[in-house]
Amino acid sequence: MKIYFTASTAEFNKYKKTYFAIRDYLVQENHTLTRDWLKHTGERIKEGDLNVSDIKKIYNKCVLAINQAQLVIIEDTVSNFSTGHQITLALQKQKPTLVLWQGKKHRYFNQMFIHGIDSEHLEIAQYKPTNLETIINTFINKYQDYNNKTRFNLVLNQYERNYLDWVQFNRATSRTKIIKNALKEKIDED
């Protein structure tokens, strides 16, 4: 699959082993990275080339890579505006997006702002190095045939149809979305 993988460069040296582990695993599993930036960025940091005069070019490459991707994976242990913006772009483009962070994030509340995003395309996972590949595999496998849509006819009794009509009118949500959300809840439960 075509995957856009990114992470923050804010603490690059501290987390580069993890970033490269994710990148290398995706490549090893024969996925195509729509933007393979880690090696180049690591070299720039190592050489002390911190003057980013080409930031508009980098931004446009990131946007293009998100557009070309089938899936987006963002390592967000070090949250910042950049990763948050890329999460938003991916979700606006309706790209299935996995947001990862290692260990417990420093926060006062048990949920963060990102947990308030109501999107069927967003998955958030806390990982340890021992289960990182499993989390990534589960995410990729879930969306392996994501673009293969199947039409399905459903027979409802009048009571069920009335309920769907009522929810559609009162909550401004399509009947299809209501049914898909109920199915997703059941899938997640099982």
Role assignments for model-derived ranges:
Residues 1-85, 89-190:
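Conserved catalytic or regulatory cores that recognize and/or transform ribose-phosphate-containing ligands
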